[in-house]
């Protein structure tokens, strides 16, 4: 009997050891970038005055310096916008959405085609901000929408954007093992393929002229992410990451680090860390986990600079004869704000959840609803910071109803489904071709 127990114990111990070794081998751990000087070009993201009011009693509420790069960029955009013969200097906000970013890729490709020989799909953009998949788009759009680039280079940027959102199979983007195996692998997907794909999008076959063009862009571009340890929102200056890098290849790595940090959704994606000059690796999360901060930050700066510019010409609420006159002066002074929601604004019904109580399906549904509400709430809240300016929006709604035979209009648990992404690219084309165009205005307050 004792011998049997000893044998059972030995077998159990052996199996436990084998499982521990296997666990150690297959568990992904963190994907780490080592980018010298990375955090020199990363700024704190002030949540704006309204959220600061809400957080008044918090022990540490960050407030940005007014001379940070994004403040300066928006200040210049406002000043440029009101110059009599200067081109418009508007703002483009690109949201997150993972594979839904294929919608934005299709949209901007079609807008570029509609512009003819100019290859300039949206004129007058001075500042671009991106979160998650929007940060990946921001890299390409800093060149594709830059009037100082050649049409050939703008077309090259659009082509690389579309290529990035046109995988032939999901494994070209992530190693997707699913939520059920998260305890084993540490995340639902490994992102080493994404790192490789971003570098290839920027430097196809080692040709990094697109990276050089990003550094020389006349458009300021920023990618937002969140530090895991304290939850602070930060953003990277994409031009500076290029211009201060020792080579274009190193610059491409720095851009990949910033955009992957902006896309690293906890649990779903492999943890992402970036080590700067001091060698300390910092864990960074998808900027969407604090979605409102970048939008709020941008709009707070726009509002402040617009009111300052109006006051310099003697226009204040006290000086105008009516609210309507003040609102009109505000509208004329403020840059236009374009918003691309790379995703839908409503979720499909899921009646099967009335019959199933499993944690994975219910947890995924709750997450989807939270993300959806977070995204549309962030867009609606833009009006709090910019009460009278023009805010123009487009979304990936209609993906399952618009007339198309391209790809498929549904997905299951895939993170990057090629056929679905093809349908989303076609949706972008469809909305650009509509009689009234892809954009519609948000109501003013």
Named regions from a protein language model:
Residues 3-29:
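N-terminal type II signal-anchor transmembrane helix
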Residues 3-4, 341-344, 360-445:
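C-terminal helical/tail subdomains of lipid-metabolizing enzymes
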Residues 19-106, 183-185:
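Active-site catalytic motif of lipid deacylating hydrolases and related acyltransferases
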Residues 91-93, 100-192, 196-198, 238-248, ...:
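Patatin-like phospholipase
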Residues 100-103, 138-139, 207, 232, ...:
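Extracytoplasmic/secreted cell-surface and envelope-processing proteins
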Residues 111-115, 132, 140-145, 162-173, ...:
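Sec/Tat-exported extracytoplasmic proteins
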Residues 215-307:
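Active-site gating loop/helix substructures
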Residues 293-294, 299-300, 308-315, 329-379:
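Internal helical hairpin/lid segments
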């Amino acid at each position: 009997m004792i011998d049997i127990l000893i044998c059972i114990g030995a077998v159990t111990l052996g199996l436990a050891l084998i499982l521990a070794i296997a666990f150690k081998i297959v568990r992904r751990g963190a994907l780490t970038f080592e980018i010298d000087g990375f955090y020199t070009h990363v700024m704190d993201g002030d949540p704006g005055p309204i959220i600061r009011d809400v957080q008044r009693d918090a022990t540490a509420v960050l407030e940005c310096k007014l001379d940070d790069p994004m403040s300066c960029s928006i200040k210049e955009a406002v000043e440029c916008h009101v110059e009599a013969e200067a081109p418009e200097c508007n703002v483009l906000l690109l949201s997150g959405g993972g594979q839904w970013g294929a919608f934005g890729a299709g949209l901007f490709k079609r807008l570029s085609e509609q512009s003819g020989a100019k290859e300039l799909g949206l004129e007058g953009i001075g500042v671009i901000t991106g979160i998650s998949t929007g940060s990946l788009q921001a890299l390409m759009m800093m060149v594709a929408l830059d009037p100082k680039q050649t049409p050939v280079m703008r077309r090259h940027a659009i082509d690389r954007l579309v290529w990035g959102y046109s995988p032939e199979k999901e494994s070209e983007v992530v190693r997707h093992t699913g939520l059920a195996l998260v305890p084993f692998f540490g995340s639902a997907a490994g992102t080493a393929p994404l790192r490789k794909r971003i570098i290839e999008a920027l430097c196809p076959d080692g040709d990094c002229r697109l990276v050089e063009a990003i550094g020389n862009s006349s458009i300021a571009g920023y990618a937002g992410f969140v530090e895991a340890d304290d939850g602070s929102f930060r953003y990277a200056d994409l031009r500076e990451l290029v211009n201060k890098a020792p080579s274009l290849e190193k610059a491409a790595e720095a851009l990949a680090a910033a955009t992957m940090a902006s896309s690293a959704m906890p649990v779903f994606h492999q943890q992402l860390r970036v080590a700067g000059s001091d060698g300390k690796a910092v864990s960074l999360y998808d900027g969407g986990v604090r979605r409102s901060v970048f939008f709020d930050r941008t709009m707070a700066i726009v509002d402040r600079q617009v009111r300052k510019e109006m006051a310099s010409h003697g226009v204040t609420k006290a000086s105008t004869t009516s609210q309507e006159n003040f609102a009109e002066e505000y509208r004329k002074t403020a840059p236009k704000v374009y918003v691309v929601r790379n995703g839908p604004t409503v979720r499909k019904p899921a009646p099967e959840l009335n019959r199933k109580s499993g944690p994975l399906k219910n947890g995924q549904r709750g997450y989807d609803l939270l993300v959806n509400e977070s995204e549309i709430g962030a867009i609606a809240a833009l009006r709090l910071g910019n009460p009278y300016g023009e805010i123009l929006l487009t979304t990936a709604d209609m993906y399952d109803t618009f007339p198309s035979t391209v790809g498929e209009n549904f997905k299951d648990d895939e993170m990057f489904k090629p056929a679905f992404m093809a349908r989303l690219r076609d949706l972008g084309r469809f909305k650009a071709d509509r009689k009234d165009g892809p954009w519609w205005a948000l109501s003013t307050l």
